[in-house]
Amino acid sequence: MNKIFFFKILLFAYLASFLRFFLNNNLLVGVIGSFVYGFVISRRVSKLKKEILLTGFCSCFTSFSGFVLFLYEISIQGYFLKLFFYLNIIIVLNLIIMYAGFLLGRKVT
């Protein structure tokens, strides 16, 4: 891995962290990240560009640990029904949004 490629991943991770700081909503962040992920994987871009966008930006932006912390906080408050619904809604919604991003990416040339 060359230094410029590594720097680009770090730059996109920094940008994602900056955006994540201002968007403190796990559902919104997950939806945006899933859409971007679906869009990028549908495009014919180089493997390096995909790694920069998906590893650098999407992975840092969506941060699975933020999602898990959100679910943990609901569970320790004893809201297990709410936990069940949030868990399922977030997963299903993100799959649908990722598929929509994929379809849109295929249509855009």
From Swiss-Prot:
GO cellular component terms attached to this protein's record: plasma membrane
InterPro entries: FluC (IPR003691)
GO BP, sorted A to Z: monoatomic ion transmembrane transport
Primary subcellular site in the record, as a coarse category: membrane
Coiled-coil stretches: none
Keyword Transmembrane part of the UniProt annotation: yes
Cellular compartments annotated: Cell inner membrane
UniProt entry keywords in alphabetical sequence: Cell inner membrane, Cell membrane, Ion channel, Ion transport, Membrane, Transmembrane, Transmembrane helix, Transport
Top-level taxon of the source organism: Bacteria
Membrane spanning residue stretches: 21-41, 52-72, 83-103
Catalytic activity, as annotated: fluoride(in) = fluoride(out)
One Pfam family per UniProt: CRCB
Bilayer disposition of the protein: Multi-pass membrane protein
Entry's family note: Belongs to the fluoride channel Fluc/FEX (TC 1.A.43) family.
Role: Fluoride-specific ion channel. Important for reducing fluoride concentration in the cell, thus reducing its toxicity.
Name of the protein described by the UniProt record: Fluoride-specific ion channel FluC
Native source species: Prochlorococcus marinus (strain MIT 9515)
